């Protein structure tokens, strides 16, 4: 059963202290006004998915086509757009806002982002090669990758050979990151360990594909309207008269 993920912005890393005194390194992710922009249905599009938007963009910096797309959904222009495949029963209404409580403490998630670009890198940095010897006749080529193999036949270097080249700035997914803490009021999700990308970069968060979903998972999604209804119901329950003693 697939449910939607969320779009978040990477704010940086810090640490949290657990009740037993242990400290945990966490990456802080900001769920910034994530709203449903469009639905993709099997009848109309051939697949089932939700299109989400996050952040805020200036209208004058948004193309006319996108302005019309956002206006149709009755949402403000967004900085980042992404689609998430979902099950038909987990579609969410257009315009709904998904909050940080979509994930709970202890849950495992998969996070995808664009890794930090490192430019042109040598074989030792890019592929963890050992390099050549420091002495014994080796000059200048200490950090080179060495021979690329082959002879007159086949007379070429095979495709995919590990060599120096561009490193980073590619799509990377880190699996099975544990959610340590969530802050729905500030829209923060704190996950244990590192997350691909630089500070200020956009990432997508999904339920871990290699871990089963817990019974406490919210379906189809944790939305702002549900949170408002829960807040309104809480005072009413507290004010209800108790029975005679």
From Swiss-Prot:
Residues 224-245 are annotated as: Disordered. It holds the Pfam family Ribosomal_L3. Keywords: Methylation, Ribonucleoprotein, Ribosomal protein, RNA-binding, rRNA-binding. Residues 230-245 have a biased composition (Low complexity). Coiled coil: none annotated. GO terms for cellular component: cytosolic large ribosomal subunit. Methylated by PrmB. InterPro entries: Ribosomal_uL3, Ribosomal_uL3_bac/org-type, Transl_B-barrel_sf. The modification N5-methylglutamine is found at residue 152. One of its GO terms (molecular function) is rRNA binding. One of its GO terms (biological process) is translation. Belongs to the universal ribosomal protein uL3 family. One of the primary rRNA binding proteins, it binds directly near the 3'-end of the 23S rRNA, where it nucleates assembly of the 50S subunit. Part of the 50S ribosomal subunit. Forms a cluster with proteins L14 and L19. This is Large ribosomal subunit protein uL3.
């Amino acid at each position: 059963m697939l449910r939607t993920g969320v779009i978040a912005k990477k704010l940086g890393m810090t640490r949290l202290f657990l009740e037993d005194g242990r400290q945990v390194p966490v990456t802080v992710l900001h769920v910034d006004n994530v709203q449903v922009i469009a639905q993709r249905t099997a009848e109309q599009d051939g697949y089932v998915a939700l299109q989400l938007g996050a952040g805020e963009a200036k209208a004058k910096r948004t193309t006319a086509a996108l302005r019309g797309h956002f206006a149709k959904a009755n949402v403000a222009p967004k900085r980042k757009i992404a689609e998430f495949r979902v099950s038909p029963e987990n579609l969410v209404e257009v315009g709904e806002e998904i909050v940080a409580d979509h994930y709970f403490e202890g849950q495992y998630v998969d996070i995808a982002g664009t890794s930090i670009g490192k430019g042109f890198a040598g074989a030792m940095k890019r592929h963890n090669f050992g390099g050549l010897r420091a002495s014994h006749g080796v000059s200048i080529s200490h950090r080179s990758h060495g021979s690329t193999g082959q002879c007159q036949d086949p007379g070429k270097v095979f495709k995919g050979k590990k060599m120096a080249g561009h490193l980073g700035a590619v799509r990377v997914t880190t699996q099975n990151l544990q959610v340590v803490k969530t802050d729905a009021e500030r829209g923060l999700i704190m996950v244990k360990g590192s997350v691909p990308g630089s500070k200020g970069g956009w990432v997508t968060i999904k339920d871990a594909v290699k871990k089963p979903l817990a019974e406490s998972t919210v379906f189809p999604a944790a939305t702002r309207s549900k949170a408002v209804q829960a807040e309104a119901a809480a005072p009413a329950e507290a004010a209800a008269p108790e029975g005679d003693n």
